[in-house]
């Protein structure tokens, strides 16, 4: 593009797709995001390439599936030297790039996450809102400067107050970055920790959401039996009924965290208006993966591919160039966000790139209901046994317009859902002989896709022999 805009890229952590009022949830409070939906395009069927933080982020930061970039686990020692992350490519193209919050392409356990060639001039790190890092944790330093003690506040009845919250800190740093930018176009990658567990919003927000008024999770009693068959597949928490999980209470606290995110996100947009930069700034709102929140008797995340866990919000707004108030139900992968950002910043897509730009839909040049024939997600030994008690699971999801196939490799189990008739995935058709034809067809399609899309054939061929 000859007209290169600024890019505000706001990424939450573990936020489900169905948590925005304007997209059909009457129980949340998201006026800022509702306005963003009306001012742009919401891709309502966007899927992450792993239901776990690091492999998902590795994928959309590189434009490759996690297994292709060889970064499939949380807690990994290092990030590969190749491929370059997209922010490095964008910085090399002349953008002033900033990062606030969590990056999580490598382990931040017992250490500050090491920097890579990431392209960021402005770097304000905070992996999580805990005081667990001796150095390099900008948020903890910010809290201490204001007389706060993070660990004590987190354990108090009122939790961390809004004025000292990580989400507030992130907005303060974003406002600082936006106000100090010069003549170069800029990209700000802002990554807040919420609504990631533990679900501990400030009391002032928690009090706004009554658990008794929550709709509760998507759960049927048959889910308990279905999950028993998958008991050998990694997950962070035990299968329980909604009552045992206090699912409505968790939902209320989760929505409270999102309400706070919405308010702080609005402060950043107000700064864009005040500085006269709104018209030339593309705004993107998304998340790295979802949250089970009691669906199917599950809480948190792990080796499953249910809609609440792998489907995420993705909203683009740039009223100057993009269509307004458009909702696209096309199948989208998070790598497509990466391709779109490269195209917006004038960076040619590398020949290895697996993302597909969304600009034709955003600008009305292509059908908003068509983008990909299928989307994929992977879980390859992604969580440490410390979190799951398991021994490492390998699984893949292949989702078409009508069906979802999940194969738990080496376990002898799988899932097949007819999404047109069972959108919340309560009836597993894997063992139903009536559906054996479509199951076998999808297994073949998924195998082909895995071989063709994730096989690394090695170095470049330079001669016939």
Segments from the language model and where they lie:
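Short arginine-rich
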Residues: 451-455
């Amino acid at each position: 593009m000859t007209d290169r805009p600024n890019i505000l890229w706001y990424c939450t952590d573990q936020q489900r797709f169905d948590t925005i009022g304007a997209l059909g949830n009457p129980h949340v409070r998201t006026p800022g995001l509702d306005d963003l939906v009306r001012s742009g395009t919401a891709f309502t069927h966007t899927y992450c390439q792993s239901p776990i933080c690091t492999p998902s982020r590795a994928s959309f930061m590189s434009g490759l599936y996690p297994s292709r970039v060889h970064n499939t686990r949380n807690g990994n020692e290092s990030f590969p030297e190749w491929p370059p992350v997209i922010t490095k490519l964008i910085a090399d193209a002349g953008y002033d790039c900033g990062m606030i919050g969590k990056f999580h392409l490598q382990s931040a356990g017992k250490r500050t996450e090491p920097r890579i060639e990431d392209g960021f001039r402005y770097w304000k790190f905070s992996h999580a809102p805990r005081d667990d890092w001796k150095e390099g944790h900008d948020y903890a330093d910010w809290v201490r400067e204001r007389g706060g003690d993070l660990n004590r506040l987190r354990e108090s009845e009122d939790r961390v107050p809004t004025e000292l919250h990580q989400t507030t800190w992130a907005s303060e740093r974003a406002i600082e970055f936006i106000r100090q930018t010069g003549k170069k176009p800029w990209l700000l990658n802002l990554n807040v920790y919420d609504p990631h567990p533990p679900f501990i919003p400030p009391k002032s927000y928690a009090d706004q959401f009554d658990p008794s008024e929550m709709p509760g999770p998507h759960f049927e009693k048959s889910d308990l039996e279905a999950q028993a068959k998958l008991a050998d597949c990694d997950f962070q928490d035990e299968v329980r009924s909604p009552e045992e999980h206090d699912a409505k209470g968790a939902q209320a606290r989760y929505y409270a965290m999102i309400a706070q995110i919405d308010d702080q996100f609005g402060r950043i947009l107000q700064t864009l208006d005040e500085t006269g930069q709104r018209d030339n700034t593309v705004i993107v709102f998304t998340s790295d993966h979802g949250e089970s929140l009691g669906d199917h008797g599950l809480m948190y995340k792990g080796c499953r591919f249910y809609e609440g866990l792998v489907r995420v919000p993705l909203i683009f707004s740039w009223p100057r160039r993009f269509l307004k108030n458009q909702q696209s139900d096309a199948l989208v992968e998070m790598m497509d966000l990466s391709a779109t950002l490269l195209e917006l910043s004038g960076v040619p897509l590398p020949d290895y790139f697996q993302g597909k730009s969304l600009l034709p839909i955003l600008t009305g040049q292509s059908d908003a209901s068509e983008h990909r024939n299928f989307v994929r997600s992977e879980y390859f030994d992604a969580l440490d046994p410390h979190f799951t008690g398991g021994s490492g699971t390998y699984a893949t999801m292949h989702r078409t317009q009508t069906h979802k196939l999940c194969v738990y490799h080496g376990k002898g189990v799988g899932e097949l859902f007819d999404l047109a008739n069972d959108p919340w995935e309560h009836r597993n058709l894997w063992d139903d002989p009536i559906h054996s034809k479509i199951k076998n067809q999808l297994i073949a399609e998924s195998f082909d896709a895995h071989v063709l899309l994730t096989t690394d054939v090695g170095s470049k061929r330079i001669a016939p022999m």
